[in-house]
Design a protein with these regions (language model features):
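Extracellular adhesion/carbohydrate-binding repeat motifs centered on closely spaced tryptophans
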Residues: 1-215, 224-226
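Compact, charge-rich alpha-helical regulatory domains located at protein termini
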Residues: 218-249
């Protein structure tokens, strides 16, 4: 198809004779399908009309044409109140994608995920802006720890001091049996005592504390072997923070 203006001259470039936009090549032929014009990609339907503010499928992938008709590429878009990301080729992203140093997850329909998400069997927390979180995060009043890959840690010691249970929440102000040992955690989640009811303490917490006297005994102290601990500590500083004093011998 060709277009001739009122003077009978053949039209080229952009024209809008009926409220729709068309693009005519240098030889005047009407463009259909995909075309690159002035550095941007556009899509023209079978009638030659430029499509805009809509998704177009091509080769099994989806592309978004903005209000100007130009294909979105390498940018965030929100055509319907949800967030999507068009990669540098213009294709709608699904699955995990690293953008400007942060990781995001996009559902199969391209919508950016946020908040709690279970993905491939693991739990992740994607903040209000959708970015994957790592490390400690306080969510809904509880503390959670997310590994470097973003997966929430469960039933695991963190930094040798804190413990997250099977729900992922850090234990606070409670006593819990873990691997046969009774641990007491303070209001900040730090474990302050550990005991199994016997005469021994674990190798990583060898200091014995006597609850009635508030005295702690280090390995090598005279009464260490005959002391039955009510509490075990990893360091003297930890014992003293719990109100215990060092034995004199």
């Amino acid at each position: 198809w060709f277009h001739f203006n009122d003077n009978g001259a053949m039209s080229t470039g952009w024209i809008s004779p009926n409220g729709h936009w068309y693009y005519l090549s240098d030889n005047g032929a009407m463009t259909t399908g995909w075309a690159r014009v002035d550095g941007s990609w556009y899509y023209f339907d079978t009638t030659g009309a430029m499509r805009s503010s809509t998704w177009v499928s091509n080769g099994g992938q989806w592309f978004y044409l903005e209000g100007s008709g130009a294909m979105a590429a390498g940018k965030w878009i929100s055509p319907d109140g949800h967030w999507y990301y068009a990669d540098r080729t213009g294709a709608m992203v699904t699955g995990w994608k690293q953008i400007d140093g942060a990781w995001y997850f996009f559902h199969g329909n391209g919508v950016m995920a946020s908040g709690w998400q279970q993905i491939s069997g693991a739990w992740y927390y994607l903040g209000g802006n959708g970015a994957m979180t790592t490390g400690w995060q306080q969510i809904g009043g509880a503390w959670y720890y997310f590994n470097s890959d973003g997966a929430m840690a469960t039933k695991k010691w963190i930094e040798g001091t804190f413990y997250v249970d099977d729900s992922g929440a850090m234990l606070v102000s409670t006593t819990r049996t873990i691997d046969g040992w009774n641990y007491t955690f303070d209001g900040n989640g730090r474990w302050i005592t550990v005991n199994n009811g016997g005469y021994s303490c674990p190798a990583w917490a060898p200091i014995k504390g006597n609850a009635s006297s508030k005295i702690y005994h280090r390995p090598g102290n005279q009464s260490y072997d005959i002391t039955k601990p009510e509490a075990c500590f990893s360091t003297g500083t930890q014992a003293e923070a719990a109100g215990y004093h060092a034995a004199k011998r």
